[in-house]
Swiss-Prot record:
It comes from Homarus americanus (American lobster). PROSITE patterns: CHIT_BIND_RR_1, CHIT_BIND_RR_2. This is Cuticle protein AMP3. Arthrodial membrane. The keyword DNA-binding does not apply. Residues 1-21 are annotated as: Disordered.
């Protein structure tokens, strides 16, 4: 959209790995992100973005990116079927073992 105007363009970088930015345009595009240094040397991000779809609805994604990877959340993202009961039980057992400090080579 050539006629879109920038409504917000804020950037704050503290120079130590901590930062925040926010950007918004008059045509409904918006993004914001906050970053912090991670405990394992990585950068941790938390943010969101949204934009209008052709049908007039708004697409929105929120996310976290940290030592566990990129973790998006949105009604637009596909969701797999639930794990069968026997798999769910195995996952619970594995989590119990992990909490007890049990490891396997």
């Amino acid at each position: 959209d050539r006629d879109a105007q920038t409504l917000t363009d804020e950037r704050n970088d503290q120079g130590d790995g901590n930062f925040r930015y926010e950007f918004e345009t008059s045509n409904g595009i918006y993004t914001q992100k906050t970053g912090t240094p991670g405990s394992e040397g990585q950068s941790n991000y938390q943010g969101s973005f949204r934009f209008p779809l052709e049908d007039g609805t708004i697409a929105e994604v929120t996310y976290i990116a940290d030592e566990y990877g990129f973790q998006p959340s949105s009604d637009l993202l596909p969701v797999g079927p639930p794990a069968p009961p026997h798999v769910q039980r195995l996952l619970e057992i594995a989590e119990d073992q992990r909490r007890q400090g049990i490891t396997f080579d």
